[in-house]
Amino acid sequence: MQVILLDKIAKLGGLGDQVSVKAGYARNYLIPQGKAVMATKANIETFDARRAELEAKLAAGKAAAEERAAKLGELAAVVIASKSGDEGKLFGSIGTRDVAEAITAAGVAVAKSEVRMGNVLRNTGDYEVVVQLHADVKATVQIQVVAL
């Protein structure tokens, strides 16, 4: 199925690219999320008329993400306290939701979906967590897990 992208999508393309994707991906994700429209003649003409408006909207979103990244860069280490055993092993784990809540409590609003972690944190110590604020903007935050 041919679609026109209205946003930059990782591993697919940028604004205005006409790409071929599987029908289910287009119908169930791209089109309902407002990230693409079907590539019909009418939609192509409409897109060409709105291209400048969409590019300005995309640039504004990236500028806002860069501003948030600068605020995240200014943060000192974010401390998360959790119950742990004698050897520093946590009772439970710290996941993306816990990290997002701690960063938000520190003063910069971050959604759970923006936090990128390989695994959950299961021990006390210092960690670096990547926060993906935009397709092109990433920030690294220092997380310090301490025992209660």
UniProtKB/Swiss-Prot annotation:
Natural source organism: Aeromonas hydrophila subsp. hydrophila (strain ATCC 7966 / DSM 30187 / BCRC 13018 / CCUG 14551 / JCM 1027 / KCTC 2358 / NCIMB 9240 / NCTC 8049)
One example GO MF annotation: structural constituent of ribosome
GO biological-process terms attached to the record: translation
InterPro entries associated with the record: Ribosomal_bL9, Ribosomal_bL9/RNase_H1_N, Ribosomal_bL9_bac/chp, Ribosomal_bL9_C, Ribosomal_bL9_C_sf, Ribosomal_bL9_N, Ribosomal_bL9_N_sf
Record function comment: Binds to the 23S rRNA.
SUPFAM superfamilies in the cross-refs: L9 N-domain-like (SSF55658), Ribosomal protein L9 C-domain (SSF55653)
Name of this protein: Large ribosomal subunit protein bL9
Domain of life of the native organism: Bacteria
Keywords carried by this UniProt record: Ribonucleoprotein, Ribosomal protein, RNA-binding, rRNA-binding
